[in-house]
């Protein structure tokens, strides 16, 4: 599927599912550089979408736009994002936070919080002023920690954690927010392959059981082919291809995007294409 076509791949594969996030004709610039060009996408409930593409292709910028994040350096000259049919720019930030949980690519705290306190911050959209958090909020936070297999860290301070443990804490915070849309930008940077696998399986499980819409950027394209229900391949701010693995994960598309010669083989268990540079 080329960039000239509307990116309606999710409608094709999940036509009976409800659309909850729509991107229409987005054009965006950093100064004179066109970083997003004619972006049209629809995301549904109960879907798992992986964004792939080389460095600088616009993946992180697109996720920020999807979540309604204000970036004074980014000039959106055309297009809109609709959250459940409402222009996201007209929705209060706290209300957006009840619908979309966003984990950026790098996030550091300047204070040495307890792990449980960091995860509890996911409950902020539901807090009622000076009354703070409830017992239910604490239970939700501890459940999120348990799902990420780090409940044993809840009374540790974040400055004591390894990079991988800290990353798991941030993922738990996103789960604690209990939104229907989960947007994750390179969430596994510091995690070993075993923990990446477990967390990807957890996300797939939550999609199936809670009808979540997960949108995630991955540098490891083979992971995207294994776990992604839908793929979006970006290059230089343009959608090069969208669709299922069979549609997107082709020699022509990947070599065009990454400007590298790839060899292909089939995964022996998942029966999806995998690549290696050569």
Spans of model-derived segments:
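Conserved structural motif at the start of ABC-family nucleotide-binding domains
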Residues: 21, 36-38
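The feature captures the beta-strand-to-loop junction immediately N-terminal to the Walker
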Residues: 52-54
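Helix-to-loop junction immediately C-terminal to a conserved catalytic motif
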Residues: 67
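Conserved ABC transporter NBD signature motif
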Residues: 75-86
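Conserved ABC ATPase "signature" region
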Residues: 120, 135-153, 178
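Conserved ABC ATPase signature
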Residues: 132, 157-161, 165
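Catalytic Walker B motif of ABC-type/P-loop ATPase nucleotide-binding domains
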Residues: 182-186
């Amino acid at each position: 599927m080329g960039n000239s076509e509307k990116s309606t791949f999710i409608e094709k594969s999940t036509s009976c599912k409800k659309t909850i996030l729509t991107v229409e004709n987005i054009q965006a610039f950093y100064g004179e550089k066109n970083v997003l060009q004619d972006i049209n996408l629809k995301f549904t409930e109960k879907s798992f979408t992986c964004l792939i593409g080389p460095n600088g292709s616009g993946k992180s910028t697109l996720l920020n736009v999807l979540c309604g994040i204000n970036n004074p350096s980014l000039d959106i000259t055309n297009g809109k994002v609709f959250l459940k049919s409402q222009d996201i720019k007209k929705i209060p930030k706290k209300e957006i936070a009840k619908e979309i949980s966003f984990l950026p690519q790098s996030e550091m705290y300047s204070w040495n919080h307890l792990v449980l306190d960091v995860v509890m911050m996911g409950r902020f959209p539901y807090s009622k002023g000076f009354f703070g958090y409830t017992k239910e909020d604490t239970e939700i936070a501890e459940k999120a920690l348990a799902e990420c297999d780090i409940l044993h860290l809840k009374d540790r301070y974040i400055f004591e954690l390894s990079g991988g443990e800290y990353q798991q804490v941030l993922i738990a915070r996103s789960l604690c927010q209990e939104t229907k849309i989960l947007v994750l930008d390179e969430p596994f940077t510091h995690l070993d392959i075993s923990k990446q696998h477990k967390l990807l399986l957890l996300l797939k499980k939550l999609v199936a059981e809670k009808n979540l819409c997960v949108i995630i950027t991955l540098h490891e394209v083979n992971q995207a082919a294994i776990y992604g229900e839908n793929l979006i391949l970006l290059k230089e701010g343009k959608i090069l291809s969208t669709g299922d693995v069979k549609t997107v994960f082709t020699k022509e598309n990947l070599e065009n995007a990454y400007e590298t010669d790839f060899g292909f083989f089939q995964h022996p268990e998942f029966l999806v294409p995998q690549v290696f540079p050569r």
